[in-house]
């Protein structure tokens, strides 16, 4: 059995100095000798702590503007030396054992994210000595504790107090894992950055410099293991980005209910990202990653009521997302009316949570407020590869629209068109959305033929007794033939919004003119597969 190891000497060298003085003081008061470098050493000395500069310890000064500080046998021998095996040779060369290394690395990611960052700026923020110490300490975790996260400081002090100044093997091993994850992520960032410069430096034109690196290195942290994946015979886990700040299903806090399933997370993501499109109080109900009801109103209660009416059958067992706080009245309406898997909102009132708590199977997530959409990448796994693209954050405003028919849309039709265009972006292709008065009337999703999606949207509306006449229709891509317009006219659609771009646009526009339909082109497609 591995024994706890005492911590008598610690080397501290950090770029992010948050909490380091308090941590160093806690170590010092517990009899730990402090070694440090450069700015960290000065900070500790200014705080009145007894600290030995690494250059004084090694007898070798920092040089080359700080590029060489800790790359010395007395440092790495003290870290890598195996207690009980290398003691004699360490004593022979006056190498003192270092029991703890506290390091975080130069801020490479923050540097290259700054506007105007040059290659020289990036190069000077590539840490060499730091990762070397981190890897050395992690390799010798049997004897040495490596600390790379300030969030671990408090727990480490607590354990030292509980174990007479020692840390257990389990703790050292866990810290070593974090250390290797830390250096792997750091090296990945550097590789991605340099790889993204290849087009610029090699004269290639296949991709803009700074977008897609030659080799893509990804780092995600496991948030939870799952009972199973999309189906019960598939194992699964949920991984998240470490530094994500945007309100999302990945950063949401679950305040009620049993663990989220694989499908819960996928559907909740679809619902939340859709509801983010709206600035007014909105509700989105999703089933199998497709919106089955969306509405905007003066309150989330009314928005929910109207979204539910689009397709009550599909809403059963669905995911509900709001862009305002979940209040008690809305919570009561939901649990009284339907079975729901997940409710997600920026926040939830205490009274609302008391109501949802009566339904133990209802999962409630709060994700915080959002201000704007954050650019990023989307991934699609194919056998043997990975498709990577920008997130679809494309939006259109009234100023971007082109009316291509003889009849101009009314103000109401224009509002309805923009509303259902936002919804269509989140419906699986081929996608058709009927809407009127900021409420979806019918949604046709995922059909191989666009005209059948249009027909399904009409059937859905008819099944629920919703009046289609006078509604707007959105299509996520162009109409290849006029049949989709004929189908829309047959149920009373009076305005169509679509990207345009078909070789038969003239025929499609002529069909709209024949039926007296106003047609708007967005010149932007929203395929979703």
Swiss-Prot record:
PROSITE patterns assigned: MGS
Which segments constitute the MGS-like domain?
A: 1-148
What domain of life does the native source organism fall in?
Bacteria
Catalysed reaction equations from the record: (6R)-10-formyltetrahydrofolate + 5-amino-1-(5-phospho-beta-D-ribosyl)imidazole-4-carboxamide = 5-formamido-1-(5-phospho-D-ribosyl)imidazole-4-carboxamide + (6S)-5,6,7,8-tetrahydrofolate; IMP + H2O = 5-formamido-1-(5-phospho-D-ribosyl)imidazole-4-carboxamide
Q: Which GO terms describe its cellular component?
A: cytosol
- Keywords linked to the UniProt accession: Hydrolase, Multifunctional enzyme, Purine biosynthesis, Transferase
Asked if ATP-binding is a keyword of the record, the answer is: no
Citing just one GO molecular function, the answer is: phosphoribosylaminoimidazolecarboxamide formyltransferase activity
Alphabetized SMART domains for the sequence? AICARFT_IMPCHas (SM00798), MGS (SM00851)
Pathway the protein takes part in: Purine metabolism; IMP biosynthesis via de novo pathway; 5-formamido-1-(5-phospho-D-ribosyl)imidazole-4-carboxamide from 5-amino-1-(5-phospho-D-ribosyl)imidazole-4-carboxamide (10-formyl THF route): step 1/1; Purine metabolism; IMP biosynthesis via de novo pathway; IMP from 5-formamido-1-(5-phospho-D-ribosyl)imidazole-4-carboxamide: step 1/1
For biological process, the GO terms are: 'de novo' IMP biosynthetic process
Q: According to its UniProt record, what is one Pfam family this protein matches?
A: AICARFT_IMPCHas
Q: Which family does it belong to?
A: Belongs to the PurH family.
Instruction: List the NCBIfam families.
Output: PRK00881.1, purH
What PANTHER family would the database entry show? BIFUNCTIONAL PURINE BIOSYNTHESIS PROTEIN ATIC, BIFUNCTIONAL PURINE BIOSYNTHESIS PROTEIN PURH
Task: Please give the record's comment on domains.
Answer: The IMP cyclohydrolase activity resides in the N-terminal region.
Name recorded for this polypeptide? Bifunctional purine biosynthesis protein PurH
